[in-house]
């Protein structure tokens, strides 16, 4: 029910003391408090903190499990396996240490005396002795009357400092890669040529020994086949043997074959005689059966 504020004010103004109005009409109630947000914040914070603690526990247990497995595997490894692993590691380190880049590989060049023996000429533009007007090592142009070193084979010219530094680690021209000095033949070739007749004589001696061994082998095998060849050789017709044997060698070969044939015939004759005598002896030693024995009763009667 709505109140008429004017009437209330007028009725209060009639009294001198204004507290009477407040006693009769109390003040309005205070506004309601705001809704409690702490009721939702507390459970969420508890869940977040609990999940973080649980995650840390899982990580800690996983770390303990991994370290325990590593200890077990290390204890189960034999000393031989550990030594093999150490050897493999050392081999890998050695291979890696042996690896060098191209510019770190040491190369062998010419001696200082050989470098100084190369011709030094003065540069003059109109002469035409030197091809080009610049050094291929430092790429600087030649100056008039400048001392240059002229390589003997390819006739390329370079500055003295440039080519001397190059030739200390190389043996060829930096421009065309031609060898700077001629390669002389080693002196041991002369000794090889001197010993060559000795080697040829030793080879001849070896050939003779091999031929004598082959003759001995021919004396043992196939006497009947060799007899045909011996008859052919004994007929007086000796043909030239190609390449390896001379006429004297063929005659000696025929003589050897004849001797082998004679020995083969003697062996065959003695063998057949021994075989015949042994078979005859066996027949004499065999007992005679009773049915084949001659009867003596007829003669006694």
Curated annotation (Swiss-Prot):
- One example GO MF annotation: zinc ion binding
Q: Name one GO cellular component term.
A: plasma membrane
Please write the reaction equations for the catalytic activity of this protein. S-ubiquitinyl-[E2 ubiquitin-conjugating enzyme]-L-cysteine + [acceptor protein]-L-lysine = [E2 ubiquitin-conjugating enzyme]-L-cysteine + N(6)-ubiquitinyl-[acceptor protein]-L-lysine
Q: Which UniProt keywords apply?
A: Apoptosis, Cell membrane, Membrane, Metal-binding, Plant defense, Transferase, Transmembrane, Transmembrane helix, Ubl conjugation, Ubl conjugation pathway, Zinc, Zinc-finger
This protein's membrane topology, according to the annotation, is:
Single-pass membrane protein
Q: Where are the transmembrane segments?
A: 46-66
Keyword Zinc assigned to the entry: answer is yes
Question: Per the UniProt entry, what is one GO biological process?
Answer: response to molecule of fungal origin
Report the enzyme's class at the first EC level.
Answer: transferase
Q: Which PANTHER family match?
A: RING-H2 FINGER PROTEIN ATL16, RING-TYPE E3 UBIQUITIN TRANSFERASE
Family, per entry: Belongs to the RING-type zinc finger family. ATL subfamily.
Protein's UniProt name = E3 ubiquitin-protein ligase RING1
Organism of origin is Arabidopsis thaliana (Mouse-ear cress)
Q: Which gene encodes it?
A: ATL55
């Amino acid at each position: 029910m709505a109140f008429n504020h004017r009437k209330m004010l007028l009725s209060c103004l009639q009294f001198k003391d204004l507290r009477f109005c407040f006693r009769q009409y109390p003040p309005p109630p205070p506004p309601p408090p705001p809704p409690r947000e702490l009721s939702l914040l507390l459970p969420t914070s508890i869940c977040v903190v609990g999940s973080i603690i649980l995650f840390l526990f899982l990580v800690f247990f996983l770390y303990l499990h991994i370290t325990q497995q590593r200890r077990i595997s290390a204890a189960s490894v034999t000393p031989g396996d550990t030594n093999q692993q150490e050897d493999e590691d050392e081999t890998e380190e050695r291979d890696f240490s042996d690896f060098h880049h191209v510019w770190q590989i040491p190369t062998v060049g010419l001696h200082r005396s050989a470098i100084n023996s190369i011709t030094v000429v003065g540069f003059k533009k109109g002469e035409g002795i030197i091809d080009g007007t610049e050094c291929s090592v430092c790429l600087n142009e030649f100056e008039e009357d400048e001392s240059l070193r002229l390589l003997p084979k390819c006739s390329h010219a370079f500055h003295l400092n440039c080519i001397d530094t190059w030739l200390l680690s190389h043996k060829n021209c930096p421009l065309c890669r031609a060898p700077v000095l001629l390669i002389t033949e080693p002196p041991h070739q002369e000794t090889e040529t001197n010993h060559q007749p000795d080697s040829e004589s030793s080879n001849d001696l070896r050939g003779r020994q091999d031929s004598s061994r082959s003759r001995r082998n021919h004396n043992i095998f196939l006497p009947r086949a060799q007899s045909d060849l011996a008859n052919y050789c004994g007929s007086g017709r000796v043909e030239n043997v190609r390449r390896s044997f001379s006429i004297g060698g063929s005659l000696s070969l025929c003589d050897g074959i004849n001797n082998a044939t004679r020995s083969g015939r003697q062996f065959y004759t003695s063998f057949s005689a021994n075989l015949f005598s042994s078979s005859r002896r066996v027949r004499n030693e065999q007992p005679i059966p009773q049915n084949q024995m001659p009867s003596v009763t007829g003669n006694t009667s």
